[in-house]
Curated annotation (Swiss-Prot):
The keyword Transmembrane helix applies. SUPFAM superfamilies: Thioredoxin-like. This is Thiol-disulfide oxidoreductase ResA. Belongs to the thioredoxin family. ResA subfamily. One of its GO terms (biological process) is cytochrome complex assembly. Disulfide bonds join 73-76. Keywords: Cell membrane, Cytochrome c-type biogenesis, Disulfide bond, Membrane, Oxidoreductase, Redox-active center, Signal-anchor, Transmembrane, Transmembrane helix.
Length: 173
């Protein structure tokens, strides 16, 4: 009985130590890698859930709202319907919304997209390479990229519909 309790405590301690260590590691390196406002957004190539290739450099001339999210993320879930509602209006004005999932299974992401009827391009960041390049920490995190391919702003956290629309206006060409 005492051995089981001791083993349980050691396991919990190891898990907590690992979580704290990971958090400190992420915080330390995220500051070094953080995307710089006013600089060119790093190019990336992904394939969306429809099988269409998306390359950031091909979107020059358009504003890009780049959103990093996860199906398990409640704030992400709350803001997705706003993005979906505003997408057609701003697509006509030259703004593209791209949602990059944080390396979950295809089935989980497809189910989420179908559940919410998302119309904008959604892709999965396999291996979290793009997340690493952009220095993303907590989800949701979004980047505003102007028509010249420069990062205008980084937004961390959930957005209201009004905030989101303000950001989309900001990058409308």
């Amino acid at each position: 009985m005492k051995k089981n309790r001791l083993l349980f405590r050691v396991i919990i301690l190891l898990i907590l130590s690992g979580a704290v260590g990971f958090t400190l590691y992420q915080g330390f390196f995220a500051d070094k890698e953080k995307m710089q406002i006013g600089k060119e957004a790093p190019n990336f190539v992904v394939t969306d859930l429809e099988g269409k290739k998306i390359e950031l450099k091909d979107l020059k001339g358009k504003g890009v709202f780049l959103n990093f999210w996860g199906t398990w993320c409640k704030p992400c879930e709350k803001e997705m319907p706003y993005m979906n509602e505003l997408y057609p209006k701003y697509k006509e004005k030259g703004v593209e919304i791209i949602a990059l999932d944080a390396d979950e299974t295809d089935i989980a992401v497809k189910n989420f997209v179908n559940q919410y009827g998302l119309k904008f391009p959604v892709a999965i960041d396999k291996g979290q390479k793009i997340i690493g390049t952009y220095g993303v920490g907590p989800l949701p995190t979004s980047f505003l990229i102007d028509k010249d391919g420069k990062v205008v702003e980084q937004i961390i956290g959930e957005q209201t519909k009004e905030q989101l629309e303000g950001y989309l206006k900001k990058i409308t060409p």
